[in-house]
């Protein structure tokens, strides 16, 4: 869910999403992935693994990847105390007495911290009603919670900070055309391979997206030459035995997406 939403978020900003990875709750794997992605890409986002339980190890793993300590962040703790709503089963909880619940909560505001950097460069509060910050490590790794509602709200809050860095803010020079097809991926693969080779020099990318359990699949054209892309519409509709649509799923009542 978060990956799909993030892909649309990137497209809306004109960000070319290069890679999505699913990493196990394994410290060595997280360290390797964080270092590699940070070295290869300008903007890296992680989702999940920052809760109170033993298997929430994103903060500690990324801290170790860059030899950083985990530091109890005073402002994050202050916001947590002010904004957290106690659950009925936690009515006996108090911040004044050490307890497993207190230690678990404090764990969520112990952040990777570089003492050589300004606080505002590495701890970002992007929503007034959320205590959870975006922890930024190595300048480009942005650590988010995995809960979709929080992930989406915080990325939306981060948008004003991202826009000044973009060559094409809000993707205004990037166009996308969607096609709905009843054919399985195997049924359009040959045509799309040929099409991709033909349009690559024009900077147009061809995509195929199976929609599991749905009646139709999606084919996309993405690029900046709108006139050229529009000239391809009839050819693509014929090649995929489908039609142009404005959004995925608008004609799900027709066709089949199953290979035979």
Per-segment meaning from a language model:
Residues 1:
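Glycine-rich, flexible N-terminal cofactor/catalytic loop recognition
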Residues 4-65, 85:
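N-terminal small/polar loop signature for handling phosphorylated ligands or for N-terminal nucleophile
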Residues 16-19, 116, 205:
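Conserved beta-strand segments of alpha/beta enzyme cores
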Residues 22-25, 75, 183:
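Short beta->alpha linker loops
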Residues 57-166:
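Proline/glycine-rich low-complexity loops and linkers
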Residues 139-237:
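An accessory alpha-helical subdomain
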Residues 239-260:
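Conserved short beta-strand edge segments in small beta-sheet-based binding/regulatory domains
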């Amino acid at each position: 869910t978060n990956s799909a939403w993030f892909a649309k978020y990137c497209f809306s900003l004109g960000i070319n999403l290069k890679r999505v990875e699913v990493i196990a709750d394994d410290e060595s794997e997280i360290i390797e992935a964080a270092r590699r992605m940070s070295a290869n890409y300008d903007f890296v986002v992680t989702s999940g693994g920052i809760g109170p339980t033993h298997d929430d190890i994103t903060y500690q793993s990324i801290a170790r990847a860059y030899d950083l300590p985990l530091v109890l962040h005073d402002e994050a703790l202050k916001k947590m105390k002010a904004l957290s709503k106690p659950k009925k089963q936690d009515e006996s909880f108090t911040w004044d007495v050490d307890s497993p619940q207190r230690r678990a909560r404090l764990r969520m505001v112990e952040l990777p911290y570089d003492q050589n950097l300004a606080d505002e460069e590495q701890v970002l509060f992007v929503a007034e009603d959320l205590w959870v910050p975006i922890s930024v490590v190595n300048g480009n790794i942005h650590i988010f919670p995995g809960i979709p509602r929080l992930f989406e709200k915080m990325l939306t809050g981060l948008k004003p900070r991202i826009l000044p860095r973009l060559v094409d803010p809000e993707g205004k020079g990037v166009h996308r055309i969607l096609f709905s097809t009843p054919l399985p991926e195997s049924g359009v693969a040959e045509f799309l391979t040929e099409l991709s080779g033909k349009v690559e020099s024009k900077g147009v990318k061809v995509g195929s997206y199976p929609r599991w359990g749905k009646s139709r699949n999606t084919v996309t054209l993405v690029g900046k030459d709108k006139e050229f892309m529009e000239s391809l519409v009839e050819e693509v509709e014929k090649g995929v035995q489908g039609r142009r649509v404005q959004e995925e799923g608008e004609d799900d009542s027709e066709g089949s997406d199953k290979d035979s």
